[in-house]
Amino acid sequence: MAPLFLPLLIALALAPGPTASADVLEGDSSEDRAFRVRISGNAPLQGVLGGALTISCHVHYLRPPPGRRAVLGSPRVKWTFLSGGREAEVLVARGLRVKVSEAYRFRVALPAYPASLTDVSLALSELRPNDSGIYRCEVQHGIDDSSDAVEVKVKGVVFLYREGSARYAFSFARAQEACARIGARIATPEQLYAAYLGGYEQCDAGWLSDQTVRYPIQTPREACYGDMDGFPGVRNYGLVDPDDLYDIYCYAEDLNGELFLGAPPDNVTLEEATAYCRERGAEIATTGQLYAAWDGGLDRCSPGWLADGSVRYPIVTPSQRCGGGLPGVKTLFLFPNQTGFPNKYSRFNVYCFRDSGQPSTTPEASXPASDGLEAIVTVTETLEELHVPREAVESESRGAIYSVPIVEDGGGARSPP
C-alpha cells in the first residue's frame, strides 16, 4: 500500500504553500508598506553652536491611511541619536503623550505633531558640540513601521585667546579687535554656555560679547570656584569695566577655504612661512581658521606657524606623543605660565590657508605627521593650576590651555645660534 500514497505525498510537497506565507514575503518588500518615512535635506545637516535646527521628517502614505477601527490611536513617533557606536533615545510620542529624555529636556519638540500626523519633524535648540551625530526618525502605525536617518554636524568652536607676551592683556575694545584679527569673532554668552554643556572647561576669565567676563568649569577646585559655590558651571563676573584687562573667548565657525600643512625640509622662520604660503597661492593661516579646521576634523601632529606669530597644531585623536590625552588645538609656549610665543627665527612647519576660489599653484610639501615633535616636551593632560598676583583677579586660576613647552636647541623646532 505504501507505493499508492507516494504520488499523493509528492503532489502535496509540490503544491503551493498557504496564502498567508506569500503575504508575509510580500509584506517584507518596501512596495507593500503602508507608508514610508523620509528625512529631507542634504546630509550632513548643518547647525551652529548655541543655535537651533529642525530635522524635517515626513510620513508618505503609499495607500489611503487605515480607518479608525484598523489601528488604535495616533502613529507612534520615536527619535533616536547615534554617536560613537551608542544609541540614545531623544523622544517618544503618541498623540499628545510625549516622553523626552533628560539630556534633551526643554531642547526638543515636534512642532507639527500631532496636529499633522504626516509631519513628525524634530526641532532641536541650544545646539551643543556633542549634538553632532546620526538622528533617526521612526514611525509605527498599526503593524507597519518605517524609519529614516540623517547625519547632523554642529559647527562652531569657542576658544580662549591671549597675547603671547602676557596674560590678561585685553580691554573690552581690544578684545573684539583681537578676535577679528585672528579670523574669528568674540563669543556670545550663549556660545560659551553651549560649549560648556559640550564638555569645554577653561579656568581663565575672558571677555564675552555682552561685556561680561566668564569662564566654564566642569571640575570645581580651589581658585576656580568663582560664584558657583563649588558647583560646575559657567562662572560670571557680571558686567565689567571695559578698561579692565582679561583674556578673550573667541568663536570661529566657517572656514570658507582650504587649510593645509606646509612642511618644507628644513622648516621655516615666521617670515619664511609667510613667503612659503604665498608661493602656493595661499596666505599664512590665522588662529581662528585653524580652530575652524580642527572643528571640521583636521588632525595634524605637527606644530606650525600661524599669522599672529603663535605655533599650534590640531589634534582630533589624542595621544601622549601629540600633546597629551585630550583633543584640541595645542599651543606652544616658551614659559611655564603659558605665555611667550616662540622666537620668530625659530623653525617650524606652517599652516597655510587658500580661499575656496583660489587654485593651487604649487603642490604642498609632505612630511610625517609628527614632524617637529622631537623638540617638544609633552605635558600631562591634568589641568594645571597657575596663580597670578591677587590684584589682577582675586583668587582665580589661570590654567588649562592645551599647551606644550618647547626646547630651542634641536629637532624640528630650531633657533639660529
Swiss-Prot record:
Residues 23-155 form the Ig-like V-type domain. It comes from Felis catus. Residues 1-22 form the signal peptide. Belongs to the aggrecan/versican proteoglycan family. May play a role in the terminally differentiating and the adult nervous system during postnatal development. Could stabilize interactions between hyaluronan (HA) and brain proteoglycans. It comes from the Eukaryota. Central nervous system. This is Brevican core protein. Glycans are attached at residues 130, 267, 337. Keywords: Disulfide bond, Extracellular matrix, Glycoprotein, Hyaluronic acid, Immunoglobulin domain, Proteoglycan, Repeat, Secreted, Signal. Residues 157-252, 257-354 form the Link domain. Disulfide bonds join 57-137, 179-250, 203-224, 277-352, 301-322. GO terms for molecular function: hyaluronic acid binding. Its main location: secreted. It is found in: Secreted, Extracellular space, Extracellular matrix; Secreted. Gene3D superfamilies: Immunoglobulins, Mannose-Binding Protein A, subunit A.
